[in-house]
């Protein structure tokens, strides 16, 4: 029985000294038992290394076996000693099971808890509580100890926390005692077991040199071993003994010094012999790292500088984190590729360790960077299971039932691809399934189906109506309906019976049985196995392990649930919450996929000291030292107060260190990380973060740089074309070609700069050579040539071939005028929208188009109803008009396309707003009619619609012998004014926003609607007036803004009705015909003034004016406008048939562009900075300029 310390700084080979002591004792006492204990995290590597050293010591380097020496972690030692003990055979309770049990305890005691009761539903709280319970156990605190601490605490938050912890902890211990073995119980059981053993002849070697702390439970095992007669040797990272008093917080070796002091005092009080300290004396690191160790342990203020160049410590900065990782990868590849005279000096991937304080900032970059560099790597961090599709399936499955089949929940289940329909007894093909799910999602987004719609037996009917449809279901629509209903009926036939059985389950065991049977029968386990096999085929061992681990964890939680709560009445809500709590604490077991791979970890974790090279990435002042943030139920202040009272309890009790203590340990933690390297230590940091904020070197690094006068290298993500040193950018062929492309792109951009002077830029010869090598490579050359060809790519669409034009458009174009307006805004957008027929998916929403359709339908129905009953609109009373409106509105709202207006309370409110608006407009139109001789003749007049029995002729234009264009449309309202034998026909277009007739846009083809509609009226005048003898003139084209205007007090000074008339005043163009204008507004027949209804005024001399808007045009001017509009239609059709698809978005008045609201930006990739991409700027034109241009232009001349 004795205690022996092996001391020394991190630069020394502690293990060499420990193994030497072990060998000497083993040779002297070969029949004794030897245990070599290390942290679980590095057990495997340590075991291999210790056995290799023993083999060398005993002269058996090729083949060596040892039965007396065991290398274990503390938990593995428990298994070795107690595997046949009854106490060790009880069922294990996993972290997930602990969370489930704690959740149930919190529920049971919710009324007694002062603080924790309200936190049960908070995400992460149960896991946080589990950590706190575990800390109490590892501190050797029993429930009665916590009760005593609560009683002694002053009233306040701490007392309330301890009160709640005591209740939960007591119930937790009672629920698990002799029933389950928790992770924290294993060491308690081991301690109890050791107290019953005679350990004389047992030699224990505890290696703590690679880290600083030993938890209270493990300290208890060491002291028990000493008491029971074992010889214990402990290696500590400590350069001096600590016997008289405990070290002060903040000193470099505070943690190991404190442990030395505690164990020394323990042995001294119990008169256990303490042998003379042994110091490790053999350096395990290169000379430059020895110097770093000496410097770090000295007084930086008194340092005189390192006289010899330090070739083992290196610094570099990069322009970004991504460049930083790429540079680390290139260095690793270069070092592995270099061969030395002595093979022992060669590097393997396993010789490299990449560390940073927190990996979060690099997490998303690791896989793409190292895969591209073809570097095998292993991230040594636990990953949560919470995001696995199986977990999502379970959560979403029960959410469907709880939320009554909401869209999001059903889609969450379907998109896990774990529940899939069977076709002829086999799982549905995955690609076909995805297509069906996507179509179903589009359909329900469009139709708003949710809730009981999912479980109805009737088929869902898919329809897609577009302009020109004849109302006949197509084969394509029928196929889409089939796919949608496949998913619909799968949900309807699969889920409701399952939910019904679950609700009827009498207890937890029955419910779990139903759930497992359901998942198994639906092929979930088969799908998980298929995922595993697919990952193995890809040689992705990590991904292959995830499905099995998740399913095993899930089944383990169900077993624990049945054991704990299986006999109790089943509650779905509680069951799901317990599963969620369980998965919250579950993580994957990390399994390296190969022995030779780069290790990536965090500097706060225990690391093996066998790595030859360490990269400390992200070495900024934000994380070195780290900003310690605690997220524990017991705060640092709570722990400080508790630590003062723990001494009053029996036994040794040590809580986890507070943030203050941890911050004091940062220097030691980083010291251990630095000295993890044996040959080389690299510090790196980006110059800026992702938000372009400047980042600075850590003060630790600055001190090291000053001490050793280290040169700092800077690496950029983009190479300098003129730099002959390409080594920082040479990696794999794929990685290197990307940098070659960057160089040649830079050269091309520079040489095409219009402002450049001097000789053309030429790339350095090394880049020319690299390009040649890569493009001529037998395996990689074809891809390299394709990638290099991208340099000559121009973002410019290629003209369509005649065959493509015919396939897309045929020989005849049937079009609305708005499509041709799109063509004039941007030819390529027209091609995407109407050639390829790309469009955004429909959603169940009240769009501007939907509200416009409602307004049009109501006003159309109102006027037709009045005409049917032979009631002139101007003579309809307020009561009559209100009754007609109510009837028509009710009929319109019953139509399927307006069901959205009854889908929610918000939509019901919007429905009332729409009804109020259309009512106001109807009364406004009636009041306008009272002042005018114009009467609505027809509404919603179709012209040129294929498949319609009623309607007017299309506007037909023959382009050439084989091509033609036919324009169709719908006129909202046609007004007629009869003056003696002269008929005037005018059109009114309803708009949901302010519109006016824009001569400039009409000239450029951006606003052709009104002129096209007037032309259609002119071509169908006889059919419209019902006589081929009548004299007909066009009255004009007017916009009416559909609105329920807001009136200010000043607006109604002239009367309320007059104010409303002014707000609803027509805008547009009218024929400058005195006879017409005189009858348009009866108030102006006897005097002058501005019309309240129409956009004109009568002057004192009796003439008429259109004002600034140039609303009045002569007959000749109107004819020229119509002729020019026809020319625009023909010119557009000619360009379309010629295959023109230029990316030529217009820009008007230096602010309005064709791309402002385009849904195709990601396809167009338009960039005005590119030489080949430029806006088509349209010179601004006034109304007078347009009319003058049309007067001087001759027929057929280009409008631009």
Swiss-Prot record:
Gene Ontology biological process terms, A to Z: double-strand break repair via homologous recombination
Record-listed E.C. numbers: 3.1.-.-
Pfam families per record: ADDB_N, PDDEXK_1
Gene3D superfamilies xrefs: P-loop containing nucleotide triphosphate hydrolases
Molecular function terms from GO: 5'-3' exonuclease activity; ATP binding; double-stranded DNA binding; helicase activity; hydrolase activity, acting on acid anhydrides
Keywords: ATP-binding, DNA damage, DNA repair, DNA-binding, Exonuclease, Helicase, Hydrolase, Nuclease, Nucleotide-binding
Cofactor section: Mg(2+)
Subunit structure: Heterodimer of AddA and RexB.
Family membership noted in the UniProt record: Belongs to the helicase family. AddB/RexB type 2 subfamily.
HAMAP family: AddB_type2
Stated role: The heterodimer acts as both an ATP-dependent DNA helicase and an ATP-dependent, dual-direction single-stranded exonuclease. Recognizes the chi site generating a DNA molecule suitable for the initiation of homologous recombination. This subunit has 5' -> 3' nuclease activity but not helicase activity.
Something else known: Despite having helicase-like domains, this subunit does not have helicase activity.
Protein name (record): ATP-dependent helicase/deoxyribonuclease subunit B
């Amino acid at each position: 029985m004795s205690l022996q310390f092996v001391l020394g700084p991190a630069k020394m080979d502690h293990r060499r000294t420990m193994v030497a002591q072990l060998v000497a004792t083993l040779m002297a006492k070969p029949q004794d038992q030897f245990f070599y204990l290390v942290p679980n995290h590095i057990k495997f590597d340590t075991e291999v290394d210790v056995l290799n050293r023993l083999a060398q010591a005993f002269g058996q380097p090729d083949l060596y076996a040892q039965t007396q020496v065991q290398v274990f972690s503390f938990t593995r030692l428990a298994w070795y000693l107690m595997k046949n003990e009854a106490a060790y055979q009880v069922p294990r309770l996993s972290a997930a099971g602990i969370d489930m049990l704690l959740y149930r305890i919190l529920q049971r005691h919710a009324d007694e808890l002062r603080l924790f009761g309200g936190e049960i539903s908070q995400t992460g709280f149960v896991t946080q509580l589990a950590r706190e319970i575990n800390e109490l156990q590892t501190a050797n605190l029993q429930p009665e100890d916590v009760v005593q601490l609560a009683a002694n605490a002053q009233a306040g938050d701490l007392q309330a926390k301890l009160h709640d912890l005591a209740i939960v902890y007591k119930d937790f211990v009672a629920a698990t005692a002799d029933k389950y073995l928790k992770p924290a119980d294993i060491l308690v059981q081991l301690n109890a077991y050791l107290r019953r053993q005679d350990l004389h002849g047992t030699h224990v070697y505890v290696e703590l040199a690679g880290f600083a702390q030993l938890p209270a439970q493990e300290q208890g095992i060491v002291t028990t071993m000493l008491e029971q007669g074992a010889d214990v040797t402990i290696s500590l990272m400590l350069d001096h003994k600590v016997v008289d008093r405990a070290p002060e917080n903040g000193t470099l070796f505070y943690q190991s010094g404190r442990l030395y002091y505690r164990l020394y005092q323990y042995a001294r009080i119990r008169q256990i012999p303490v042998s003379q300290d042994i110091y490790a004396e053999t350096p395990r690191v290169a000379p430059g790292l020895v110097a770093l160790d000496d410097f770090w342990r000295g007084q930086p203020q008194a340092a005189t500088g390192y006289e010899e160049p330090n070739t083992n410590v290196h610094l570099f900065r990069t322009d970004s984190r991504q460049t930083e990782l790429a540079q680390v990868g290139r260095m690793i590849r270069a070092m592995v590729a270099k061969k030395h005279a002595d093979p022992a000096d060669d590097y393997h991937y396993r010789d490299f360790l990449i560390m940073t304080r927190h990996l979060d900032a690099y997490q998303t970059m690791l896989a793409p960077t190292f895969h591209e560099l073809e570097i095998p790597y292993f991230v040594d961090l636990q990953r949560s299971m919470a995001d696995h599709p199986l977990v999502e399936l379970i959560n979403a499955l029960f959410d469907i039932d709880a939320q009554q089949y909401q869209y999001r929940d059903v889609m969450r289940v379907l998109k896990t691809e774990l529940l899939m329909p069977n076709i002829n007894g086999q799982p549905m093909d995955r690609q076909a399934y995805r297509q069906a799910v996507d179509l179903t999602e589009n359909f329900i987004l469009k139709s708003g189906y949710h809730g009981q719609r999912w479980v109805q037996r009737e088929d869902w009917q898919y329809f897609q109506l577009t302009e020109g449809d004849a109302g006949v279901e197509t084969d394509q629509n029928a196929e889409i309906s089939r796919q949608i209903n496949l998913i619909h009926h799968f949900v309807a036939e699969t889920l409701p019976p399952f939910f019904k059985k679950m609700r009827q389950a009498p207890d937890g065991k029955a419910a779990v049985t139903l759930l497992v049977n359901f998942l198994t029968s639906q092929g979930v386990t088969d799908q998980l196995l298929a995922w595993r096999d697919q990952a193995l085929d890809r040689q992705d061992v990590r991904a292959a392990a995830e499905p099995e681990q998740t399913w095993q964890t899930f089944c383990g939680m169900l077993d624990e649930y049945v054991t704990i709560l299986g006999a109790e009445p089943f509650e779905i809500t509680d069951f799901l919450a317990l599963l969620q709590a369980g998965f919250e604490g579950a993580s994957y077991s990390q399994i390296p996929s190969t022995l030779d791979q780069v290790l990536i970890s965090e500097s706060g974790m225990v690391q093996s000291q066998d790595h030859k090279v360490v990269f400390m990435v992200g070495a900024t002042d934000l994380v070195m030292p780290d900003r310690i943030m605690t997220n524990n139920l017991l705060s640092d202040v709570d722990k400080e107060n508790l630590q003062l009272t723990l001494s009053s309890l029996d036994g040794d009790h040590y809580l986890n260190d507070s943030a203050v203590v941890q911050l004091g340990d940062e220097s030691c933690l980083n010291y251990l990380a630095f000295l993890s390297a044996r040959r080389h230590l690299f510090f790196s940091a980006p110059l800026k973060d992702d938000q372009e904020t400047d980042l600075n070197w850590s003060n630790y690094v600055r001190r090291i740089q000053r001490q050793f006068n280290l040169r700092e290298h800077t690496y950029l993500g983009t190479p300098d074309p003129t730099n002959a040193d390409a080594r920082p950018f040479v990696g794999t062929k794929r990685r290197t070609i990307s940098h070659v492309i960057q160089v040649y792109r830079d050269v091309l951009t520079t040489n095409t700069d219009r402002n450049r002077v001097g000789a053309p830029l030429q790339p350095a010869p090394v880049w020319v050579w690299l390009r040649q090598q890569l493009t001529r490579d037998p395996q990689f050359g074809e891809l390299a040539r394709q990638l290099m060809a991208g340099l000559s790519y121009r973002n410019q669409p290629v003209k369509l071939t005649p065959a493509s034009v015919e396939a897309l458009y045929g020989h005849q174009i049937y079009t609305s005028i708005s499509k041709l307006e799109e063509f004039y805004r941007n030819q390529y957008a027209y091609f995407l929208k109407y050639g390829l027929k790309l469009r955004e998916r429909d959603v169940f929403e009240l769009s501007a188009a939907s509200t416009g359709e409602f307004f049009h339908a109501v006003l159309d129905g109102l006027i037709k109803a009045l005409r049917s009953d032979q009631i002139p609109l101007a003579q309809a009373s307020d009561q009559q008009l209100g009754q007609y409106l109510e009837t028509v509105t009710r009929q319109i709202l019953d139509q399927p396309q307006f069901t959205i207006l009854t889908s929610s309370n918000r939509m019901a409110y919007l429905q009332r707003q729409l009804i109020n608006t259309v009512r106001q407009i109807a009364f406004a139109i009636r009041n306008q009619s009272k002042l005018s001789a114009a009467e609505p003749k027809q509404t919603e007049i179709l012209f040129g619609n294929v498949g319609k029995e009623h309607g007017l002729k299309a506007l037909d234009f023959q382009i050439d012998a084989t091509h033609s264009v036919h324009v169709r449309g719908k006129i909202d309202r046609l007004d007629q004014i009869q003056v003696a034998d002269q008929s005037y026909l005018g059109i009114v277009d309803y708009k949901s926003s302010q519109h006016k007739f824009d001569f400039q846009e009409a000239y450029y083809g951006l606003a052709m609607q009104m002129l096209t509609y007037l032309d259609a009226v002119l071509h169908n005048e006889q059919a419209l007036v019902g006589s081929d003898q009548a004299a007909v003139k066009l009255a004009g084209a007017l916009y009416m803004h559909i609105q329920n205007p807001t009136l200010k007090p000043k607006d109604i000074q002239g009367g309320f009705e007059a104010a409303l008339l002014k707000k609803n005043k027509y805008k547009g163009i009218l024929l400058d015909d005195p006879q017409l204008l005189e009858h348009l507004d009866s108030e102006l027949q006897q005097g002058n003034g501005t019309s309240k209804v129409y956009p004109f005024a009568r002057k004192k001399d009796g003439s008429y004016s259109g004002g600034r808007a140039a609303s009045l045009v002569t007959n000749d001017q109107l004819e020229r406008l119509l002729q020019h509009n026809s020319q625009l239609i023909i010119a557009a059709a000619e360009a379309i048939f010629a295959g023109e698809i230029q990316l030529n978005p217009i820009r008007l008045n230096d602010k309005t562009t064709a791309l402002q609201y385009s849904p195709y930006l990601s396809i167009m990739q338009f960039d005005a900075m590119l030489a080949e991409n430029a806006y088509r700027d349209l010179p601004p034109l006034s109304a007078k300029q347009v009319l003058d241009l049309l007067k001087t232009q001759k027929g057929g001349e280009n409008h631009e």
